[in-house]
Amino acid sequence: MQLKKITLCLLAAGLHLIAFSQIEHVEPLNWWTGMKNPALQLLINGKDVGSTTAVINYPSMSIKKCTKGQSNNYLFIDLIIAKNTKPGTFNINFKKEGNTVYTYQYSLLAREKDAALLKGFNPADAIYLLVPDRFANGDYSNDVVHEMREKKIDRNFDGARHGGDIRGIIDHLDYIAGMGYTAIWPTPMLENDMELYSYHGYSITNHYKVDPRFGSLDDYKELAVKAKQKGIKLIFDEVLNHTGSNYWWMNDLPFNNWLNKPDSFIRSNHRRTVNQDKYASAYDKDMMTNGWFDKTMPDMNATNPFLAKYLIQCTIWWIETLQLGGIRQDTYGYSDKTFLTNWSCSIMKEYPSFTMVGEEWSLNPLITSYWQKGKQNQDGYKSCLTTIMDFPLQSALVDALKEKEGADFSKGLAGLYEALANDFVYADPKNMLVFGDNHDMDRLFTQLNKDVDLTKMALAYLLTIRGIPQLFYGTEILMDNTGHHKNDGLIRSDFPGGWKEDSVNAFTGKGVSNDQMEVQTYLKKLLNWRKNNPVIATGSILHFAPFDGIYVYFRYNKEKTIMVVMNKNPVPVKIDVKRFAEILKGKKKAENIITGDPVSIQDNIAVPSKTTAVFSVE
């Protein structure tokens, strides 16, 4: 086929020749043939590139339009990639007054087989959340990168970088898989070229670059491949709402409205209810959506169509590049909600079996449920977001285990029972993300006042109730931040054994306490049991109102019945099973899934003190 020359972007020519030397950025870095959406928009950044004419030569490709940014250093090229376009490399020639001033080679890759069928995490999975800088240091050579603004490692300061990296995660995939996890969620590993607190990853300064202190893009790809080989899905932690204040474009924005409130720092009021509140003032809505999350985190204006396209394509690029098993979206609800619909629906159109979870930190299920796909909202708002983090249930679980049992029908285990009863407000409760803690709140062991038994009770609940369980690294060894409430750096402490100089190694068991070993062993047993019992992922729930510090619920399908008994009492109890006849009728035996002991369920069931007992009913 003869190549057809296509010349576009005949922009207003200047009166003098450009002093044009190079293209600084072309994003996305590459693209693929065979995508469902044939459109691709390239962001081109380089000195005076807006005054050039872009010329390409490639078969089966057309250009819809080109748009110059308000800064003359940006050009946006909209391409249409036909279904029959072949993978390959083509030149983008940038011309001025008939002369080519720069040529950039761009690549169209062939998609991985069945990439469009990528499956996201689901209720059959158990997710291990980890902070890469604090998990394991597998490559000491990248601890300090002199080109970066934060140049030191200091494990004695909880706000500094400690040296964990992608190699450290790869090195311990066997541990993660052996524990029974089937998905990992590392906090962001993209470039965070900030002077301070760059370890956490949420001040991104380049959406298309892995932070070199974590490793390279090849390392990230290796992690994805090796995790998949071990049955572990990789979840990408993304931030659409804001960037870091040292982002490469900050001193020369493509458009004047690329950021919200760009001229002075105004903090978000964090009033997330304005998205649903029919009485909310325009002032409060503006402060919520357009205020900055923090003074080093500029708020991106996703109502700008070029930025919106940029962010959507960025998500797709990472899904396709790493063959991801899911996206976790930070600060969901802070961005423009029309954009959030466009973003979520664009991703799901390209990957219909994918999963994305949004962080909506509200304890009100009426607020959290608003964002989930399938929800019939009064204001007509529609979303394609599959999964929501279940903050209401997290809070109810901790309160239930800490509060005294009594006559108040909304306290203690009764509060947990009623929290689950709120599931009628969710479009798809089985796809809620359930958790006891995460990297932004006090550790579960701390929240439960360092009570080992209550911690085990919480873990058993999370692994047997509806939803997709997410556990935080170190929970298995009772890591805590007691005495340092909401100290983020301490909450995200180093995992013992992740550094070669560590005297304690929780990966091998060297030096761990008896309590730590007990919980680690207990959790490993539960996780691996759950992985092999699909009734927990897909089965129905039947629960009975708590009484006398005891809460009983069942997970069941046609093939199997699981009985869960939460006994919060400080003494063992015997439970009369007659109350549960509607589900236990005709069943006589069960097995304690932790101890393996047989149990008769014809009369009474004995349950130890402060225990969540799980029985497989025969």
Task: Locate each region found by the language model.
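Bacterial Sec-dependent N-terminal signal peptides
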Residues: 1-28
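Short, solvent-exposed loop/linker segments at beta-strand-coil boundaries, enriched for Pro/Gly
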Residues: 58-65
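Conserved, mostly hydrophobic/aromatic
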Residues: 130, 176, 186, 207, ...
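Active-site-proximal helices and loops of the catalytic beta/alpha 8
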Residues: 224, 242, 314, 320, ...
